[in-house]
Regions:
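Active-site nucleotide/adenylate-binding loops and adjacent lid/helix of ATP-dependent enzymes
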Residues: 1-108, 113-116
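Protein kinase-like catalytic core scaffold
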Residues: 19, 121-123, 219
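Anionic group-transfer/hydrolysis microenvironments
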Residues: 24, 90-91, 111, 126-128, ...
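Short acidic-glycine loop/turn motifs at beta-strand connectors
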Residues: 36-41, 114-119, 150-152, 213-216
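ATP-dependent carboxylate/phosphate-activation module, predominantly the ATP-grasp catalytic core
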Residues: 48-80, 99-191
Length: 245
């Protein structure tokens, strides 16, 4: 939500110290910032924005304001309100994910479909691993997708890096296996996605980005009403017809 007051914003920041702020209507990690509270100012730890092309013209000045370092809590609050930014707790991912890519949370995209009789099902699931030191894991330029076997929770296929043509069966930064990677507590991840699919029945097709926290619990980061069904085809090198029918 973006309807928080300055006192609520400050209370949240003081509780968690390190927070995430992100626009409520963007994609691919654009405009995300990791901020750390230091006294009465925030230090910008890292950003999901790659350059000025990732922010709208009217927000360019605000982008540079945050990008350049320390800002007062009031200035950051004003920036968030002006640009409809959400504020979130900074989440530490489980060690099995950070071992593969320590810079990002490495969420799991679980795409669900709600049938006419209101029965949820999972169409497909895929790991999102960041690389190149990026904090976001769903950016086309800095993400490796791995298709997950829904029964075993293991990665079976990876997508092609469109910039280089490489297929990374091992993570290019850490050298850890991507193909064969076993997701932690995957049954809980699936259960959470199926439960979430019932919350907004008007949206029958949603791609849930779910994190496995450091304590092993699953938590939804966001839901995407444009879940990128082409991801399945790009990763599996197969069509979706047999999956959807």
């Amino acid at each position: 939500a973006t309807d928080y007051t300055l006192d609520e914003f400050m209370g949240f920041a003081e509780k968690y110290k390190r927070i995430i702020i992100k626009p409520d209507n963007m994609y691919a990690g654009i405009g995300i910032y990791v901020l750390e509270l230091s006294g009465k100012s925030f230090h910008v730890i890292s950003s999901g924005a790659r350059d000025d092309t990732d922010v709208s013209a009217e927000n360019t000045a605000s982008y540079h304001m945050l990008k350049d370092g320390y800002e007062s809590t009031k200035a950051v609050y004003d920036f968030c309100k002006m640009n409809n930014y959400c504020i979130e707790e900074y989440i530490e991912g489980h060690r099995v994910y950070s071992k593969v890519s320590p810079s990002s949370l490495n969420t799991i995209r679980v795409t669900t479909y709600l049938s006419d009789d209101k029965k949820p099902s999972i169409i497909f699931a895929a790991n999102q691993f960041g690389y190149k030191g990026c904090i976001v894991d769903n950016n086309d330029d800095s993400c490796i997708w791995g298709l997950i076997d829904l029964e075993t929770g293991a990665v079976t296929d990876v997508d092609i890096d469109t910039a280089t043509g490489n297929i990374y069966e091992k993570h290019p930064d850490s050298g850890q296996d991507i193909v064969g990677f076993k997701n932690y507590n995957f049954e809980a991840v699936k259960k959470l996605a199926l439960e979430a699919a019932l919350v907004i029945p008007e949206c029958r097709l949603i791609g849930w980005d779910i994190a496995v926290r450091s304590d092993g619990t699953a938590e939804i980061i966001e839901g995407n009403v444009t879940p990128e069904l082409d991801l399945y085809q790009a990763i599996s090198h197969k069509g979706l017809r047999t999956v959807l029918i």
